[in-house]
Amino acid sequence: DSRHRMFNILKVSEDINPKNYSVKEDGKLEIEWSEGDHTSYYDPNWLRENCYTIKNKQKYVSPYNLWDSSLQKNLKSIQIDHDEIINSDEGLVKWLELLHYTGIAIVKNAPIEKNSALKVLNRISHTRETFFNTPFEVINIPKPNNSAYTAHALRNHMDLPWFENPPGYQFLHCLINSAKGGDSSAVDAFAVADYLRNNEKDIFDILVNTPLKFRDKDYTQEAVRSVYGTAISLTKDGDYNDIRYSIATLDALDCHPDIMDSVYKAHHRFGNLLHDAKFQINFRLEPGDIFSFNNRRLLHGRTEFDPNSGHRHLQGYYMDRDE
């Protein structure tokens, strides 16, 4: 039962009201309406869940486990074995819970053949296609159309912030990592946002309320993509919904002159906190690891690596959270 509304609710007048009402023996509320010769029955649990009083709304508790650099001491808590996901629904649920509540999970002991991550990813759903192809190859190439395809260090960032709807999840499958350098970093941007909300509210409010432009120019497609979005977006309950942030692709500031200075300072502060050691964890991906995370919560980066000292090859995949 989809519970989709089949009748035209717009034909119900704005002045409709209960004609008679009573509580039945099973606890349900019975209402006879003033028009339409219709009687409704409401379960008390449904009424409580949909009660819109301020007192009821204050009961909301965030499901997210916010974390900082202290997670470095317990990286095993975000690890799960590849075969556990493949062979059991319990393993799949554990993986999904890590992704949803903590925003990060490292799948261990996956095969290291090209495209082999698709099997475990399909335990969740199908991947999302982009112009980077699936999978996209994270390797050092001579003429890259993205900074990821170089040996340079990458500051903590989300992928594709210039998309209208950036991918919800990202998966980086390590095939080879023998080069010197190339260690990974991650930061819970929800935790950084929460720090600002509790300690620097003026900056937090600017990041929530001021849309800025993100832009990408891709020579391989002769295309320019851009979109406006706030660095922090919230749910109706005031919880964290999305982070949209990448220093590399944040375009020239485009806001009212009266707030330009404060907007610049707010983004400067946010960017610095997203790289602060007190919020960041660091680790090295080993062949067979799949670094999986909420792309609209967790920012990721890497240190510079020496392509002459060995090889580094990751395959990347995207997936929408709706899936």
Regions found by a protein language model. Name each.
Residues D1-S88:
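Motif-centric detector for short Cys/His coordination patterns
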